[in-house]
């Protein structure tokens, strides 16, 4: 082509159709193929790679070390005791991950093997998707999915445009228009494309779906033509072609370098407060384990210092043992004790927690109260790792538009040339009395006629001044609505289904036959309003825009579009009128338009904008500028240079936009209404009652934001509203913050609300962060207006890292809000009608803001209660399990004799005690869901991770240690030293004694779980009592047969011997009742003396028509403690149908039905109690 391609690392050069230079001096760049690989493993690397990933987890690695120690040295327990549970956990996880990866392989093969047509050697060749190379020209037909990231070359339309939907990428269902450059748009056949000689230079792959910079250099008749390429030219892999027969595009990014593949990379992992607490507890128990092992080792050597205990006759040392190093023996004994006590660390905790989170997350999607019938949207769970975090929220950060409001804009009022109008039935009516007005209104439709594309007010106009003023007023009105009709990115679909987009296709259609769609609802509302007034936008091509003005078609040449961005907060178009005049029309926030204006009714319009904002309306200002031919030539050249730049294109474009968008003439302002969603006020008030602070972060102007905050209850009328706005310097900002802090201190009795704008916020965070945070912490509600997206994310991070480390939620609905959702501890996406990018990138997605109350107060409350109890109970039952093993060493002179049989050691956590806590963690409801939602104050009872505090952790730990003492010493004293408890005069041996302790322990920890359960179903009964029955049946079976593959038969007939002894049964019942009686007494006294709000609500529930869900500890108010204890003992002993819950029971579904309650479980006949 006569030039050397660039070799910068941040750009790539693509020769269309892979026609490389023939001069031999060019070395083609290497690009990857078009295969998509979403799988993690292959047949050859699955085992080593999966094992490596699993053993990176601390718990798995710990048990692997224990297993290896058991293999290397002589330990008191079989390696099977730690090896089998570890093998079970690793195997289950590997099977799950292997199956998921197999599904990914199948999906990859289906995608990579999809048939596509590629232009090669002057014809269409059918091949597979994986064979597409960068530079290939690909043909895509209607409704097909793009197999790679393509730059559009041509379509079946004359203007080279096409429509696509990107719903699978960003969730937006509206059609997007993409256009080809003019030089390739005419190449609509394979033969024509075969003559194309062109090169594309573009940036290297990146994940941003909305960013693409490049240029196409076309050689025609030995002349090079350079055209800029942007996002409008790029067709993304995964998007679908719509309303277009076929297109041709050249592949620029393939395979794992496509934007779709780059966006599939996992998000940064969020860790919940419960997970952090669990890791802390693991470290504490690891310290306890090491301490017990060290103490045991020291005591062993202290004991054996006396000769009579050194070498008992049954355990004589060998010569090698006598001569071995004491240090090595000490280490060996320490490791042996470590193995003996290692089960204090629960290996199955991680697996159980993962299962609980995964299965529990389905309840959110199944909840009909979170289903929005109008949009047919149910709640979505994109991550199950944060379920319990929903019960710990202290701050809610939310956007206004689309989150608190419906995002359905309706044009209400406008200001034109310093006069205010409101729309009534397609007529612009001036507000207030007008001179010489007989009817009191102005019909714009009847008052406009056009001469040379300008309108004038006819004699029928109800508002007349002088002819000169009329002409000026007419021009301003005309330009205002032309600006509204031309300055936008709205697209059109009509009643026609074919041929859409072929030139001026809508010219003959009536406005009622046109349907506008746009990514911005503001633009759609304004264009529709202009159409009702009489200036109808009827279609556009790449180069023209057409409007009908009172039935007369006018075609404007679209010269340039200066796209909207959040920094400028405005957009502009440069058009050429039929008269040849060139105009720039701009619209945007008043803070971005008014400073650029040098003419027009600036002050009057500013007042009108403030008045609109006080009504809660969204405002935009409209302005224009007319260019001379010389001015336009300079602008056109500078825009071309900036748009064709491959380096720093965005910065260069920003400079050019700043140069163009100045010296504007203000035309007026628009005001559209975005009404609040249903029950927003009630939801915000409920959040406030729950102790959750709500911050609204919006880009709207100050007055609009305050008005909406008042109307939605974010600010209430009795609240003292403080303002930190319009600050110009650091010193001024600091002084204002100090004044606000003093006012809060002086008026500490009343609630305060704070309003901050983006400029003042930047100053406050720059030098006065601590002072600003002090003011915010003492405010019940904070409103941040005129905020840029980056500022929103920064505010959330500021609260997250504050000393209190509060849990935050971010609620947003827009694609530019993803960073805020990902910054918050929990991201909540609001599923709008057309904007679902935020929902897809969130942790949870709901259809309406009002659903947030049930998500937090019911689901969050239940999830936290369940998993907090699960974690504490797991450590409790393992303390009960291992502490007797430690205490037993005092009786066997620390000889490392195990108390339990190896099979019991292996199955305790896997089979005997795992299911009751798992079912509890899935189904538990300690109080009726409706009460939780109607009494938001109950949310405070679980805030700040109360159930996993050090105090609660110590209670469960001490409880476990105390029960362990009862198990061991109770068994020892009840069966008696040297006592004969069998009919044949024999005594209990070591294994019988250990089995007795184990039996009491299994029954006690299982019934303890029953005491903690408030919500009983047949599943709870099955797994709770079934676990105890299974233990007895298994023990009878295990001890009743001689198993030839076992190394020893220590347990043969042991359990049968135990259960045949009446004394043993007496000991079992007495110890179980003793342990549980103490638990029951503590529950009664706590509820009588220090009841929480939740427990008081349970008492209320007891006396209401809904029966109490706390089957053990809910008693009528005024009942004496003695009576309460008697009732509780009756319930413990005769625990028939514990809850008697009346929640729309369903006999048809044995598990649950969802009838607008979180769970509805199958009934049991309460009359039997």
UniProtKB/Swiss-Prot annotation:
The keyword DNA-binding does not apply. Mg(2+) binds at residues 399, 401, 813, 817. ATP binds at residues 399-401, 523, 564, 587, 618, 698-700, 786, 792, 816-817. GO terms for biological process: phospholipid translocation. Its cofactor is Mg(2+). Its main location: membrane. It is found in: Recycling endosome membrane; Early endosome; Endoplasmic reticulum; Golgi apparatus, trans-Golgi network. Residues 794-802 are annotated as: Required for binding to the RING-finger of HLTF. InterPro entries: ATPase_P-typ_cyto_dom_N, ATPase_P-typ_P_site, ATPase_P-typ_TM_dom_sf, ATPase_P-typ_transduc_dom_A_sf, HAD-like_sf, HAD_sf, P-type_ATPase_IV, P-type_ATPase_N. It catalyses: ATP + H2O + phospholipidSide 1 = ADP + phosphate + phospholipidSide 2; a 1,2-diacyl-sn-glycero-3-phospho-L-serine(out) + ATP + H2O = a 1,2-diacyl-sn-glycero-3-phospho-L-serine(in) + ADP + phosphate + H(+); a 1,2-diacyl-sn-glycero-3-phosphoethanolamine(out) + ATP + H2O = a 1,2-diacyl-sn-glycero-3-phosphoethanolamine(in) + ADP + phosphate + H(+). Catalytic component of a P4-ATPase flippase complex which catalyzes the hydrolysis of ATP coupled to the transport of aminophospholipids, phosphatidylserines (PS) and phosphatidylethanolamines (PE), from the outer to the inner leaflet of intracellular membranes. May contribute to the maintenance of membrane lipid asymmetry in endosome compartment. Component of a P4-ATPase flippase complex which consists of a catalytic alpha subunit ATP11B and an accessory beta subunit TMEM30A. This is Phospholipid-transporting ATPase IF. It comes from Oryctolagus cuniculus. The lineage of its organism: Eukaryota, Metazoa, Chordata, Craniata, Vertebrata.
């Amino acid at each position: 082509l006569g030039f050397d391609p660039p070799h910068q690392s941040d750009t790539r050069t693509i020769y269309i159709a892979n026609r490389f230079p023939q001069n031999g001096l060019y070395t083609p760049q290497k690009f990857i193929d078009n295969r998509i690989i979403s799988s993690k493993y292959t047949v050859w690397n699955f085992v080593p790679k999966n094992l490596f990933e699993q053993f990176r987890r601390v718990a798995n690695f710990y048990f692997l070390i224990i297993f290896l120690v058991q293999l290397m040295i002589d330990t008191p327990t079989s390696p099977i005791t730690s090896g089998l549970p570890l093998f079970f956990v690793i195997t289950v996880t590997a099977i799950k991950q292997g199956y998921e990866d197999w599904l990914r392989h199948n999906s990859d093969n289906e995608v990579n093997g999809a048939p596509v047509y590629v232009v090669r050697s002057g014809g269409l060749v059918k091949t597979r998707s994986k064979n597409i190379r960068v530079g290939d020209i690909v043909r895509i037909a209607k409704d097909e999915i793009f197999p790679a990231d393509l730059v559009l070359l041509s379509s079946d339309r004359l203007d080279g445009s096409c429509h696509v939907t990107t719903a699978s990428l960003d969730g937006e269902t509206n059609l997007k228009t993409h256009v080809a450059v003019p030089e390739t748009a005419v190449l609509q056949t394979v033969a024509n494309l075969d003559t194309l000689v062109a090169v594309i230079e573009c940036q290297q792959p990146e994940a941003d779906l909305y960013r693409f910079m490049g240029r196409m250099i076309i050689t025609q008749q030995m002349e090079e033509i350079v055209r800029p390429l942007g996002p409008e030219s790029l067709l993304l892999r995964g998007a679908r072609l719509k309303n277009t027969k076929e297109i041709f595009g050249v592949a620029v990014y393939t395979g794992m370098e496509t934007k779709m593949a780059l966006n599939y990379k996992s998000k940064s992992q969020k860790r919940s407060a419960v997970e952090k607490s669990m890791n802390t507890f693991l470290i504490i128990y690891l310290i306890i384990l090491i301490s017990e092992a060290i103490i045991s080792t020291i005591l062993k050597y202290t004991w054996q210092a006396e000769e009579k205990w050194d070498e008992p006759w049954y355990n004589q040392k060998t010569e090698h043992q006598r001569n071995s190093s004491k240090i090595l023996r000490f280490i060996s004994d320490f490791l042996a004790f470590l193995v003996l006590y290692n089960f204090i660390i629960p290996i199955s905790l991680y697996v159980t927690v993962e299962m609980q989170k995964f299965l529990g997350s389905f309840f959110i999607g199944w909840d009909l109260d979170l289903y929005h019938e109008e949009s047919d949207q149910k709640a979505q769970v994109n991550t199950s790792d944060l379920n319990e975090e929903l019960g710990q929220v202290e701050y809610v950060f939310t956007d206004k538009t689309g989150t608190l409001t419906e995002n359905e804009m309706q044009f209400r009022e406008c200001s034109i040339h310093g006069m205010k109008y409101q729309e009534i039935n397609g007529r612009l009516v001036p507000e207030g009395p007008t001179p010489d007005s007989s009817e009191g209104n102005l019909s714009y439709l009847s008052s406009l006629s056009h001469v040379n594309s300008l309108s004038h007010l006819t004699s029928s106009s109800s508002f007349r001044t002088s002819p000169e003023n009329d002409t000026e007023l007419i021009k301003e009105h005309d330009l205002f609505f032309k600006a509204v009709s031309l300055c936008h990115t709205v697209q059109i679909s009509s009643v026609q289904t074919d041929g859409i987009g072929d030139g001026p296709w809508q010219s003959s259609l009536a406005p009622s036959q046109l349907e506008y769609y746009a990514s911005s609802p503001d633009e759609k509302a304004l264009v529709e309003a202009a159409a009702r007034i009489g200036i109808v936008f009827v279609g556009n091509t790449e180069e023209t825009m057409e409007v009908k003005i009172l039935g007369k078609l006018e075609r404007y040449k679209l010269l340039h579009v200066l796209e909207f961005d959040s920094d400028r907060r405005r957009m502009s178009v440069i058009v050429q009128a039929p008269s040849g005049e060139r105009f720039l029309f701009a619209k945007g926030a008043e803070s971005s338009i008014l400073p650029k204006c040098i003419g027009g009714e600036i002050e009057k319009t500013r007042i009108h904008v403030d008045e609109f904002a006080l009504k809660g309306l969204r405002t935009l200002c409209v302005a224009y500028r007319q260019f001379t031919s010389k001015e336009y030539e300079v602008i056109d050249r500078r825009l071309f240079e900036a748009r064709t730049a491959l380096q720093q294109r965005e910065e260069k474009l920003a400079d050019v936009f700043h140069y163009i968008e100045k010296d504007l003439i203000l035309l007026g302002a628009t005001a559209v209404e975005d009404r609040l969603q249903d029950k927003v006020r009630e939801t915000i008030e409920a959040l406030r009652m729950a102790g959750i602070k709500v911050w609204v972060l919006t880009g709207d102007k100050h007055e609009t934001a305050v008005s909406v905050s008042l109307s939605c209850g974010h600010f209430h009328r009795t609240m003292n509203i403080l303002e930190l706005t319009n600050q110009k310097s650091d010193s001024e900002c600091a002084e204002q913050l100090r004044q606000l802090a003093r006012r809060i201190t002086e008026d500490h009795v009343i609630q305060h609300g704070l309003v901050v704008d983006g400029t003042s916020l930047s100053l406050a965070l720059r030098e006065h962060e601590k002072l600003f945070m002090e003011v915010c912490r003492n405010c019940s509600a904070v409103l941040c207006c005129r905020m840029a997206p980056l500022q929103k994310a920064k505010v959330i991070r500021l609260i997250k890292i504050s000393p209190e480390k509060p849990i935050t939620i971010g609620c947003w609905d827009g694609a530019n809000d993803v960073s805020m959702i990902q910054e918050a501890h929990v991201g909540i996406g609001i599923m709008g009608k057309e904007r679902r990018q935020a929902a897809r990138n969130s942790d949870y997605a709901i259809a309406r803001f009002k659903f947030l109350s049930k998500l937090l107060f019911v689901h969050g409350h239940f999830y936290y209660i369940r998993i907090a109890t699960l974690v504490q109970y797991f450590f409790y039952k393992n303390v009960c399990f291992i502490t007797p093993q430690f205490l037993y060493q005092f009786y066997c002179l620390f000889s490392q004799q195990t108390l339990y049989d190896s099979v019991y050691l292996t199955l305790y956590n896997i089979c005997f005690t795992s299911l009751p806590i798992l079912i509890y963690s899935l189904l538990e409801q300690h109080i009726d869901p409706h009460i939780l939602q109607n009494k938001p104050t109950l949310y405070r009872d679980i805030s700040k991770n109360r159930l996993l505090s050090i105090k609660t952790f110590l209670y469960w730990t001490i409880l476990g240690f105390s029960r362990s003492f009862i198990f061991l010493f109770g068994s020892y004293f009840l069966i008696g030293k040297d006592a004969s408890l069998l009919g044949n005069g024999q005594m209990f041996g070591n294994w019988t004694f250990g089995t007795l302790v184990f039996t009491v322990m299994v029954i006690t920890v299982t019934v303890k779980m029953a005491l903690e359960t408030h919500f009983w179903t047949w599943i709870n009964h099955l797994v709770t009592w079934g676990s105890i029955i299974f233990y007895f049946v298994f023990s009878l079976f295990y001890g009743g047969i001689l198993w030839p593959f076992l190394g020893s038969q220590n347990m043969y007939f042991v359990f049968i011997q135990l259960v045949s002894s009446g004394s043993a049964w007496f000991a079992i019942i007495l110890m179980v009742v003793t342990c549980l009686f103490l638990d029951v007494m503590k529950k009664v006294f706590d509820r009588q003396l220090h009841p929480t709000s939740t427990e008081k609500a349970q008492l209320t529930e007891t006396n209401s028509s809904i029966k109490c869900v706390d089957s053990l500890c809910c008693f009528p108010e005024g009942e004496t403690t003695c009576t309460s204890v008697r009732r509780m003992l009756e319930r413990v002993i005769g625990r028939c149908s514990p809850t008697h819950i009346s929640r729309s029971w369903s006999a048809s579904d044995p598990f649950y039905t969802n009838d607008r309650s979180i769970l509805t479980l199958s009934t049991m006949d309460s009359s039997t109690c």
